[in-house]
Amino acid sequence: MVFTQRSFIYTIWDSAIQNSSMNGLAEVTGPVVIMGVAGCGKSSFAAALTHALGWQLIEGDDYHPPENVNKMRAGIPLTDEDRAGWLVVLAQALVQHGPQAVLTCSALKKSYRDSLRRGVPDLRFVHLELTREQSIARVSQRPGHYFQPTLVDSQFAALEKPVNEAGVLTVDATLPIETIQAQVCAWLQAKECV
């Protein structure tokens, strides 16, 4: 059997689910945005979460227009104007996919999160947090990805941490995936998370 990174994550995730309580998650609805700077594990965690819950995955990077991808590939940071149309499209995708969807999106600024919330009131966010050094190390290990390590500093410059922001859970992105899973699932079940 050939293991890809994603199938390895699913194997770990399934094991974690078998060893933990998922009671009550059948009633949980989203949608939920997995946010954070490049390299924090948005795609890996969102894929594992959607697999565990049976929800749909919306990979935000897949919705970037070619102009945005070309800029990032060239090492040019995106501007608010570059992201504006992309965020509208992501909000539309959330509406189309319904309440059982997980979106990956950096959502670095509060205005970006608010743009998504305009399309989906009471939208919840899981902020996977890590340091600049950890981000650079992780992004450097993604050969072939259009996001260049030189862009990490621009992400941290743009980041407005969602401190005391309603509907946001911040989690240490360096924790084991089963620990993140336990924190997120407990939060999703709590009435005060929305």
Residue ranges and their predicted role:
Residues 2-29:
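Extreme N-terminal, non-catalytic leader segments
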Residues 34:
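Hydrophobic anchor at the beta1->P-loop junction of P-loop NTPases
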Residues 37:
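P-loop (Walker A) phosphate-binding loop of NTP-binding proteins
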Residues 42:
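Conserved lysine of the Walker
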Residues 47-89:
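Conserved substrate/cofactor phosphate-moiety recognition/catalytic segment
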Residues 81-120, 128:
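Glycine-rich phosphate-binding loop used to anchor ATP phosphates in small-molecule kinases
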Residues 120-138:
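Conserved phosphate-donor/acceptor-positioning beta-strand/loop module used by diverse small-molecule
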Residues 141-185:
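Small-molecule kinase domains that catalyze NTP-dependent phosphoryl transfer to phosphate-bearing small molecules
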